[in-house]
């Protein structure tokens, strides 16, 4: 089970797709969409990222920052971001320490095979650093619209 709403979002530091260290606390004062996804350039993850990209102007207008996190490398994030022209930072959690911190790393099943990986989850964090909403078992195609609606932003 991921961390619940109503608690402070744990701070962390990860490298972004420009190889720059980013701390969550650097973004205090802004609403943040912190979304965890399994892997760069895979069908569901691409759909989710591209929907955030397509709605990016609405997020920007509302002052909402999007941060994507996966266990991929910085190099992988660079390729993914360039290929799909993603306008928001992607953070490399190669050792899945932040996934563990937010409790979104766990057992998964695909084509009958069980393995450990990222459980697609999004945290909405307010300007005070509090988790205000958690989306579990995210459906990539509809997710950006759900997030905007949760922030009260028209789509």
Report residues per predicted region.
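Chalcogenol-based redox active-site neighborhoods
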Residues: 1-155
């Amino acid at each position: 089970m991921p961390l619940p709403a109503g608690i402070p979002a744990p701070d962390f530091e990860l490298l972004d797709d420009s190889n720059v260290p980013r701390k969550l606390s650097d973004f205090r004062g802004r609403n943040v969409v912190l979304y965890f996804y399994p892997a760069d350039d895979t069908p569901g993850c691409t759909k989710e990222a591209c929907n955030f990209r397509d709605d990016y102007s609405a997020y920007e207008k509302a002052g909402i920052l999007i941060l994507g996190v996966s266990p991929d490398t910085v190099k992988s994030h660079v390729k993914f971001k360039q290929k799909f022209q993603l306008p928001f930072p992607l953070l490399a959690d190669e050792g899945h320490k932040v996934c563990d911190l937010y409790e979104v790393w766990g057992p998964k099943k695909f084509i009958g095979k069980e393995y450990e990986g990222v459980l697609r989850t999004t945290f909405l964090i307010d300007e005070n650093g509090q988790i205000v909403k958690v989306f579990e078992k995210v459906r990539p195609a509809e997710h950006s619209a759900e997030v905007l609606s949760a922030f009260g932003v028209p789509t």
